[in-house]
């Protein structure tokens, strides 16, 4: 079977993001007898270049407010060994020609799956509420025994309105230490991947275009197709199915 044409097709299927290690795994699952050295050579010949990850740079959150601060319960966990043990919540901004669009997500720390997301033109508490509601519905409308919801100390997560929603589903809140965003590194790493592989590769004309495109990237590609080396080169959904 000729393999020379296959790397470009597999590369395009990765949204032109895979380097040779993940592309090798992709081709092997398509029953191509290739090794990393050969795939690297074929990529050079075709002029294909993946999107290398950027070094994680934490950004602190303004936490000077009167909201309730939960203790950092995540720090006391020896390890995360199952899904629905820890969810991590965070907010980022996406640039468009019409101004900033804000994205809130809830991520399963075990599988890296984005369970919930919401978009807004403002940083109102409704944004993080909507993302958590989607995550809860993704898991059948309820939390799990002992589930932690970890976030930074942002005013949205500390508000009384937000705190009522985890409490209603028996989800225990946890918050990062002041000025220490490494506590929420999984969510920050997701945002870095999103911006590098998707957001910064095009210019969105308005909020609606960005919403549609980012939703499709998260749900159709990131959750279900994108391979993660930390997950044994599986997608988050495949990793959950294997470890359910």
Feature locations, PLM:
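Charged DNA-binding/catalytic regions of mobile-element recombinases
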Residues: 1-244
């Amino acid at each position: 079977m000729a393999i020379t044409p296959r790397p470009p097709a597999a590369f395009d299927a990765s949204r032109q993001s895979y380097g040779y290690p993940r592309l090798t795994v992709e081709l092997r699952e398509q029953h191509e007898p290739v090794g990393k050295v050969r795939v690297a050579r074929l990529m050079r010949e075709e002029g294909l270049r993946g999107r290398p990850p950027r070094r994680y740079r934490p950004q602190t959150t303004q936490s000077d407010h009167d909201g309730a601060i939960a203790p950092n319960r995540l720090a006391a966990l020896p390890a995360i060994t199952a899904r629905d043990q820890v969810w991590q919540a965070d907010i980022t901004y996406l640039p468009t020609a019409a101004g900033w669009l804000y994205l809130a997500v809830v991520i399963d720390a075990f599988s890296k799956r984005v369970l919930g997301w919401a978009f807004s033109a403002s940083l109102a508490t409704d944004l993080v509420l909507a993302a958590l509601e989607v995550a809860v519905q993704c898991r059948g409308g309820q939390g799990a025994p002992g589930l932690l919801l970890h976030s930074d100390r942002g005013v949205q997560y500390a508000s009384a309105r937000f705190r009522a929603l985890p409490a209603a589903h028996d989800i225990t809140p946890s918050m990062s230490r002041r000025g220490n965003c490494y506590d929420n590194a999984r969510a920050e790493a997701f945002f870095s991947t999103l911006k590098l592989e998707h957001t910064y590769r095009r210019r969105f004309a308005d909020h609606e275009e960005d919403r549609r495109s980012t939703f499709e990237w998260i749900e159709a590609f990131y959750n279900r197709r994108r391979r993660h080396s930390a997950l044994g080169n599986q997608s988050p959904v495949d990793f959950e199915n294997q470890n359910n």
